[in-house]
């Protein structure tokens, strides 16, 4: 689940010249399986409501209670699986970090790992009710991703006594981001001085390149695909870190592909525009 102000993957926002981020907001929810849905409705300024502790876009809302992030979802799935997706997700951080990471030297892009270790309770219709572990982070940017990056990959992997995150990216000027951090249960964060090597993996069905960091000699592999696109992949990845086998979340984003104009009309099918919205109160 991702909440956007200035929806970076919205063709409508791109076609608008990225002038008004508040006029292109959405709450993107993806569920999988037989009853899986993909929701990414691009909504206008009238749908957006913000306060210190809440963020609402149209019928869906995020609320921070001081201890939990409560996400009330009321969305409509895009093609090819139309239909309502409604319910609640509650994320309870084990701890909240104070870390902010610059992904570009001028802080034009930053990453905030708010709660890399969290418990999640999901109750969504149709067909999704479970509890497990999760995470809560955010990216902030003053420019389009494709204006600064050609490729990036990110992974979060829970271990027995900590969680590790890897952020590897190539900027358009060919400089690199190579970030490896360890998050402890108390919320303390430290950079990993000698991160494991970066290993290439099998490409996706769309031939998106994938790589992650793991122990030397290990063979990371996708175990469950969550979202595949011509420029993007999200999957559960099995790998080995410090001798421990783990399954975590992995993303890969090819921004050279995303930059191609031909993709924008394709995205418009999956990202419908709904400019008008009236809150009942």
Curated annotation (Swiss-Prot):
Gene Ontology BP, a term: spheroidene biosynthetic process
One MF annotation (Gene Ontology) recorded for this entry: hydro-lyase activity
This protein's pathway: Carotenoid biosynthesis; spheroidene biosynthesis
The reaction(s) this protein catalyses: rhodopin = all-trans-lycopene + H2O; 1,1'-dihydroxy-1,1',2,2'-tetrahydrolycopene = rhodopin + H2O
Superkingdom, natural source: Bacteria
EC number: 4.2.1.131
Record keywords: Carotenoid biosynthesis, Chlorophyll biosynthesis, Lyase, Photosynthesis
Keyword Lyase: yes
Protein family membership: Belongs to the CrtC hydratase family.
Biological role: Involved in the biosynthesis of carotenoids spheroidene and spirilloxanthin. Catalyzes the hydration of neurosporene to the corresponding hydroxylated carotenoids 1-HO-neurosporene and that of lycopene to 1-HO-lycopene. It exhibits negligible activity in converting HO-neurosporene, HO-lycopene, or any other derivative such as spheroidene, 1-HO-3,4-didehydrolycopene.
Name of the protein described by the UniProt record: Acyclic carotenoid 1,2-hydratase
Source organism (scientific name): Rhodobacter capsulatus (strain ATCC BAA-309 / NBRC 16581 / SB1003)
């Amino acid at each position: 689940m991702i909440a956007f102000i200035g929806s970076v993957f919205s063709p409508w926002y791109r076609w608008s010249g990225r002038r008004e981020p508040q006029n292109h907001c959405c709450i993107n929810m993806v569920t999988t399986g037989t009853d899986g849905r993909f929701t990414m409705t691009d909504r206008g300024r009238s749908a957006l409501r913000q306060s210190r502790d809440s963020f609402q876009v149209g019928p869906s809302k995020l609320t921070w209670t001081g201890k939990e992030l409560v996400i009330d979802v009321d969305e409509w799935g895009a093609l090819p699986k139309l239909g309502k997706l409604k319910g609640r997700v509650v994320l309870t951080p084990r701890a909240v970090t104070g870390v902010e990471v610059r992904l570009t030297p001028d802080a034009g892009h930053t990453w905030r790992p708010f709660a890399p270790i969290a418990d999640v309770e999901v109750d969504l219709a149709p067909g999704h009710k479970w509890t497990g572990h999760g995470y809560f982070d955010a990216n902030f940017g003053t420019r389009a991703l494709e204006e600064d990056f050609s490729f990036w990959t990110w992974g979060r992997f829970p271990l027995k006594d900590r969680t590790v995150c890897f952020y590897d990216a190539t900027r358009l000027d060919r400089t690199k981001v190579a970030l490896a951090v360890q998050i402890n249960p108390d919320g303390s964060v430290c950079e990993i001085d000698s991160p494991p090597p970066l290993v290439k993996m099998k490409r996706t069905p769309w031939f998106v390149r994938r790589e992650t960091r793991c122990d030397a000699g290990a063979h990371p592999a996708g175990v469950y695909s969550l979202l595949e696109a011509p420029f993007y992949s999200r999957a559960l990845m099995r790998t080995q870190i410090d001798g421990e086998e783990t399954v975590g979340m992995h993303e890969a984003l090819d921004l050279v592909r995303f930059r191609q104009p031909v993709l924008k009309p394709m995205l418009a099918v999956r990202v419908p525009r709904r400019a008008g919205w009236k809150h009942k109160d």
